[in-house]
Amino acid sequence: GLLLFPTATKKLRRMWAFPSILLLSIVMIFSTXLSIQQINSSSIYQYVWSWTXDNDFSLEFGYLIDPLTSIMSMLXTTVGIMVLIYSDNYMAHDQGYLIFFAYMSFFSTSMLGLVTSSNLIQIYIFWELVGMCSYLLIGFWFTRPSAANACQKAFVTNRVGDFGLLLGILGFYWITGSFEFQDLFEIFNNLIYNNQVNSPFVTLCAALLFAGAVAKSAQFPLHVWLPDAMEGPTPISALIHAATMVAAGIFLVARLLPLFIVIPYIMNFISLIGIITVLLGATLALAQKDIKRGLAYSTMSQLXYMMLALGMGSYRSALFHLITHAYSKALLFLGSGSVIHSMETIVGYSPDKSQNMVLMGGLRKHVPITKTSFLLGTLSLCGIPPLACFWSKDEILNESWLYSPIFAIIAWATAGLTAFYMFRIYLLTFEGHLNVHFQNYSGNQNASLYSISLWGKGCSKRINKNFLLLKMNNNESSSFFSKNTYRSDENVRKRNRGRPFINIVDFYNQKSFSYPYESDNTMLFPLLVLVLFTLFVGILGIPFNQEGRDLDILSKWLAPSINLLHQKSEDSTDWYEFLKNAIFSVSIASFGIFLASXLYKPIYSSFKNFDLINLFVKTGPKRSRWDKIINILYXWSYXRAYIDTFYTTSXTGAIRGLAQLTDFFDRRVIDGITNGVGVMSFFV
């Protein structure tokens, strides 16, 4: 009986996943019914009851059901259900299985409470609960120092934004005397119309409110917690990046847009932060080796597209991209979890190895379903039609030209970067050969190695056979394909007076290898469902409103909110303009995919790329300058733009120095005075 007890309890505890999934499914059914009602009737529901009442002060609690609420509740429930089903298998062997599901359910509940809130105080309460849940889940494996540090970093960074949010809430209560959204918007618009507000103070309060969204949605400069949040289990990474925590910041700005839209400086500030984050997130994703961190920086960049759209006043485009990105990014994160799960059969439980794209490659032969779903998510994020993100991102890109040509150029260029780094992740993970069998990561002298020195792929220091391909002058600077920490044997380099542009290194070994395998059905089912969303959810926002037929579902859904913002929906779509812009955006994305394929496609399986690469590779002083530029870009990307280093040396270092000074003052000065008085009294 004692021998069978652990097996029996494991099966019993997995039963507790069912109530969580069932309850969230019931909420999803209610959310779907509310969404259908709103599409048909364009209505807004609000119910409020008094929590505390006084002569001069009253605090109400209630719920507000409008298009924004129904969209966010649909996202949170549909993605949440898929993540919970996926987690049942992913976390089955974890000792904290039950507490993980408790945290996940509480996380979903907090997010649903946040999106249904009818006033700022209620939003702030659930805002803090969402932050607390993220702290618990990011640090779920708290015995690992990296996870413990990551959850503390996320908590402290979000406290900065939350403090600004609290001050902004109090500031607007001081101005309007109300926390309720409907009253707040009406009173504030009247004050603006009658010119009865202090513009600098109002702008400051609005900026403080926006600071909360900057921290929660990982916008520059409070984005530093997001890549470290990947230390948590992969299912929670999917939930945070798709439908809960980072979406909360976008939700807050969208909810308060009627307030921000009458303060021009704030709208400009929101769009500026958005465009900076768009470019920064894309450049930081270029050289990441951890598959989840690469996707995290992708999330940061895509959230900035939404923030840019909100700053431009394009409410519909921002929410459309929020919907399409949520399903595509959930698919990518759950797909990466399936990859990590399969890699653990070879490297064991070691995030440094199982998440490292250096050791991946060739997985398409072993995990074909995961590969196909990941490829569809990648194509969607790249903006390839007819997948979901193509429709929403194109809308933002087109509207950016009307707002600012400079912002538009950056946004369009970043679309090409997005295609480049996403296909880099895909190619390093699924194409070529399984590099874990050719990497000497275990320290064995007989380990096989068959590697290409690329961004994201290393070259051994021990070389038996060195095929020199595409030789170039031996300069101190390394090439685009290599980082100077990945060096060939020095004697080989001196003997050949050149560094190989591509090193192919081969070791022979009689050892038999194990191979990854496809995940179980409970992990594949959510992937297939999210594939369907990725394929078809874009239909919601396609502007089919020609010849008197209005089939634009998203515009009908958002009609009450758009009317509140005093915006007009376009009656018809200029299909010539649409096709022209679509062809341009797809061309940019295709160019990014082409570059990624040329640089990261496995060379050892196709030597046809050499002639193409030779067109771009020439020796001489110009090549040396190009290598320096590439090294600077690599160091910028891999070192996270040095922002973490700056915070560590300036903010963290200053706080620690102040703490040490305070400790010295307490021990030496305060205690010294006390002890001195005691000694003096002894002599007296």
From Swiss-Prot:
Signal peptide: none
Transmembrane region(s): 16-36, 65-85, 96-116, 123-143, 161-181, 206-226, 234-254, 256-276, 303-323, 330-350, 372-392, 401-421, 524-544, 583-603
Membrane topology, record value: Multi-pass membrane protein
Pfam families: Proton_antipo_C, Proton_antipo_M, Proton_antipo_N
UniProt subcellular location: Plastid, Chloroplast thylakoid membrane
GO cellular component terms given for this protein: chloroplast thylakoid membrane
Keyword NAD: yes
Keywords in alphabetical order: Chloroplast, Membrane, NAD, NADP, Plastid, Plastoquinone, Quinone, Thylakoid, Translocase, Transmembrane, Transmembrane helix, Transport
GO molecular function per UniProt: NADH dehydrogenase (ubiquinone) activity; quinone binding
Biological-process GO terms, alphabetical: ATP synthesis coupled electron transport; electron transport coupled proton transport
Enzyme Commission number, as recorded: 7.1.1.-
Coiled coil: none
Claim: Chloroplast is one of the keywords in the record: yes
Reaction(s) catalysed (UniProt annotation): a plastoquinone + NADH + (n+1) H(+)(in) = a plastoquinol + NAD(+) + n H(+)(out); a plastoquinone + NADPH + (n+1) H(+)(in) = a plastoquinol + NADP(+) + n H(+)(out)
Domain of life the protein comes from: Eukaryota
Enzyme class: translocase
Family as reported in the entry's similarity comment: Belongs to the complex I subunit 5 family.
Biological function: NDH shuttles electrons from NAD(P)H:plastoquinone, via FMN and iron-sulfur (Fe-S) centers, to quinones in the photosynthetic chain and possibly in a chloroplast respiratory chain. The immediate electron acceptor for the enzyme in this species is believed to be plastoquinone. Couples the redox reaction to proton translocation, and thus conserves the redox energy in a proton gradient.
Subunit structure: NDH is composed of at least 16 different subunits, 5 of which are encoded in the nucleus.
Designated name of the protein: NAD(P)H-quinone oxidoreductase subunit 5, chloroplastic
Record organism: Sesamum indicum
Gene: ndhF
